[in-house]
């Protein structure tokens, strides 16, 4: 189960091209070495880095741009003897009740956040892939950086801290959600970029409303993505940054219209087949190649 909050803003999308290859190569060489940390790919797509919570070091953190709020495994909260309080959050297609706690400090790479409120859950029950993780780091903490660069070829993440003097006190409470504009059979759709998802999830009712004549083949009901139950189908005419292709999608009924307005689903970063992704939280843009 992935626990989500609300997306309060979206970002524009830019694509890497051969003309700016020299510029994008500078992203890594220009980075100060302490800002670059290694990561491992868990399950072929989850980005896992080492982090610290309080005095607990060597913890496994998963960086997840599809989660608005960070989630800490319950055993970590128990080891820190933290007081829990219940609260409701939105999770893909419904509201769920989860516990929250105040953590003294959280650190991954050069990023250190103090006195932060985060969700607490039993991650092993949420996902087989993230069950070994100690925390899922969502946009609330990722957006305390100015930029996040994910380099799949070298298995490095570059985290550039913000200028604390330029960041408003309330900015941490308003994480940005990065969206990707794609074409489905000639129609524009908008998908949330999700490093914590492998494939493509579409809200079927929103897609059919946007594209009444949408063509789907090989539909199979009773499919599961974690705890989510929906169906799978082959979607022809899907285009991101290249020729159209047929893709397999997971279809789910969307939330009510005032939740995630204008969002048609989620795009797992593995679907981009990118070597490098850069998220710029200050300019509110994203690039990949």
Over which residues does each language-model region extend?
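N-terminal Sec-pathway targeting helices
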Residues: 1-3
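Bacterial N-terminal signal peptides
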Residues: 5-15
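Pepsin/retropepsin-fold aspartyl endopeptidases
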Residues: 16-289
């Amino acid at each position: 189960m992935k626990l989500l909050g609300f997306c309060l803003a979206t970002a524009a999308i830019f694509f890497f091209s051969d003309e700016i290859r020299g510029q994008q190569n500078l992203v890594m060489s220009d980075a100060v070495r302490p800002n670059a940390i290694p990561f491992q790919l868990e399950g072929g797509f989850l980005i896992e880095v080492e982090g610290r919570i309080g005095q607990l070091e060597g913890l496994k953190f998963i960086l997840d741009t599809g989660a608005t709020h960070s989630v800490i495994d319950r055993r970590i909260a128990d080891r820190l003897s933290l007081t829990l309080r219940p609260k409701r959050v939105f999770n893909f297609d419904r509201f769920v009740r989860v516990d929250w706690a105040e953590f003294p400090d959280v650190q991954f790479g050069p990023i250190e956040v103090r006195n932060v409120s985060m969700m607490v859950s039993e991650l092993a029950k949420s996902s087989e892939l993230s069950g070994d993780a100690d925390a899922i780091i969502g946009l609330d903490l990722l957006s305390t950086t100015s930029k996040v660069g994910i380099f799949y070829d070298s298995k490095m993440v570059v985290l550039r801290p913000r200028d604390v003097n330029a960041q408003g006190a309330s900015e941490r409470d308003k994480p940005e959600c990065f969206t990707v504009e794609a074409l489905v059979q000639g129609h524009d759709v908008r998908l949330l970029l999700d490093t914590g998802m492998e494939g493509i999830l579409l809200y079927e009712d929103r897609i059919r409303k946007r594209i009444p004549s949408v063509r789907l083949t090989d539909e199979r009901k009773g499919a599961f993505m974690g705890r989510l139950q929906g169906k799978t189908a082959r979607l022809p005419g899907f285009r991101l940054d290249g020729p159209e292709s047929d893709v397999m999608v997971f279809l789910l009924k969307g939330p009510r219209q005032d939740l995630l307005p204008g969002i048609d689903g989620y795009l797992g970063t593995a679907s981009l087949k990118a070597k490098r992704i850069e998220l710029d939280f200050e300019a509110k843009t994203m690039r990949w190649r």
